[in-house]
Amino acid sequence: MSTVKEQLIEKLIEDDENSQCKITIVGTGAVGMACAISILLKDLADELALVDVALDKLKGEMMDLQHGSLFFSTSKITSGKDYSVSANSRIVIVTAGARQQEGETRLALVQRNVAIMKSIIPAIVHYSPDCKILVVSNPVDILTYIVWKISGLPVTRVIGSGCNLDSARFRYLIGEKLGVHPTSCHGWIIGEHGDSSVPLWSGVNVAGVALKTLDPKLGTDSDKEHWKNIHKQVIQSAYEIIKLKGYTSWAIGLSVMDLVGSILKNLRRVHPVSTMVKGLYGIKEELFLSIPCVLGRNGVSDVVKINLNSEEEALFKKSAETLWNIQKDLIF
């Protein structure tokens, strides 16, 4: 006797099991799952794979997402501890790592996370040799460098989430001060994703009107409106959120979704993400820092050459020095 399925459906051709737009997320903590839900709701993938070592949590997260399948358009959600589940991914998002503790700087995390990267990156590259790797784990700039070295991939295909979120926070806070939506407030933060990041006040504008032309002291210590405090708030944001709720998740998840969309859809949008800066702005070492990058299907296809003023260039070099002082002593 035929089954209900056989009576209902007549197969005409065999299914094509190969995903065309597969994304893997390594790490199913708060950040990984925020990335997952953001990507699913934006319909960026036809398959989403989750990888983690905590098998019960991993299965629970997978089932929870699968049960929401009616509400998004990703046809397949899989999970596993073995990296074979990630095979043939277009993008692999790395969120795994030791979580930042209250009061702990991103740089203090680095050595704890190096060993984790060594355990996962070779398997990622083995199963998805043509992928782009998007590193989100902190300290993201140094870990992106480490992932690049371990992976053997072209530098253009290993990208750190970098200052994409810092710049979003910057624009939000500028918008709050002006009463304007952040999409209409333009401003960039470059350098380290963290305490030594560099705000480019010279380029901050609304509708093409540079705020520096309205007040040349904007963003300086002598600025009576205290615009400089906005950058201080950007730096303190993560620490404050961690103190209040234990971790950051939603904003970084949305930021990652933004980057993934630019890559998969070949949008060639410009984002401040972490990439190799050796040879730029007088940097002589192999360092990854955020600068404006054009993102498309090949990863970082171009960088935008910003005309930094003397103060901004000095701060950028200081940011590079901060990272180099940690990176040069790493053992991996």
From Swiss-Prot:
UniProt keyword annotation of Mitochondrion present: no
Primary residence: cytoplasm
Domain of life: Eukaryota
Pfam families, A to Z: Ldh_1_C (PF02866), Ldh_1_N (PF00056)
Catalytically driven reaction(s): (S)-lactate + NAD(+) = pyruvate + NADH + H(+)
InterPro entries named in the record: L-lactate/malate_DH (IPR001557), L-lactate_DH (IPR011304), L-lactate_DH_AS (IPR018177), Lactate/malate_DH_C (IPR022383), Lactate/malate_DH_N (IPR001236), Lactate_DH/Glyco_Ohase_4_C (IPR015955), NAD(P)-bd_dom_sf (IPR036291)
Protein residues bound to substrate: 106, 138, 169, 248
PROSITE patterns: L_LDH
Cellular component terms (Gene Ontology): cytosol; extracellular exosome; mitochondrion; motile cilium; nucleus; oxidoreductase complex
Pathway: Fermentation; pyruvate fermentation to lactate; (S)-lactate from pyruvate: step 1/1
Keywords linked to the UniProt accession: Cytoplasm, NAD, Oxidoreductase, Phosphoprotein
Localization in the cell: Cytoplasm
Active site per UniProt: 193 (proton acceptor)
Modified residue annotations for Phosphoserine: 301
Binding site for NAD(+): 29-57, 99, 138
Enzyme Commission identifier(s): 1.1.1.27
Entry function: Possible role in sperm motility.
Family: Belongs to the LDH/MDH superfamily. LDH family.
NCBIfam families reported for this sequence: L-LDH-NAD (TIGR01771), PRK06223.1 (NF004863)
Subunit structure of this chain's protein: Homotetramer. Interacts with RABL2/RABL2A; binds preferentially to GTP-bound RABL2.
Protein name stated in the entry: L-lactate dehydrogenase C chain
Lineage: Eukaryota, Metazoa, Chordata, Craniata, Vertebrata
